[in-house]
Amino acid sequence: MTQSLPDAAEQVAAAEKESALVRIIDDEIDVREALALMLRIEGWTAKTYPNARAFLIEDDVRRPGCLVLDVRMPLMTGLELQNEMLRRGLMLPTIFLTGHADIDVAVSSLKRGAVDFLIKPVNDEILLESIAAAVHCDFLRRAGVAGGEGGIRTFSLMPIKSKT
């Protein structure tokens, strides 16, 4: 029996979700814990870090997934981490999530390859859509599929429509 395209796509998405890791870096413990809980309820595996340096020391970026990153943090800002990741050749798709909206920072992060730039408090559905797209792009990039890396940059410039 042949599966329909939507069923096959759902299985691929489920397989990606099962093996992906969503890394959350935020200096506010309440934010980290709330995001991690929401992601786990939605079936994602999440790991939290209190700052960028802890992430750089502890994380295994060989595992596919994405990064949900606060902008303003002590020790190393989100933008500084993004720059350090680029310097090291770490290609993990990054979603910035901040309570401090700044157009210059948003544009700068997107130009450097961020997948998305979202403002706290963020709608859970919008964040989940952004995470799913980022993870999918990471799997494509790792598989060497055309559009994996470019798909991230294209997606970063597309607005996400609210479902409210």
Regions inferred by a protein language model and the residue ranges of each:
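Acidic catalytic/metal-coordinating carboxylates
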Residues: 50-51, 76-81, 101
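Non-catalytic signal-transmission and effector/linker regions of two-component phosphorelay proteins
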Residues: 1-23, 29, 36, 51, ...
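C-terminal output helix
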Residues: 102-104, 122-132
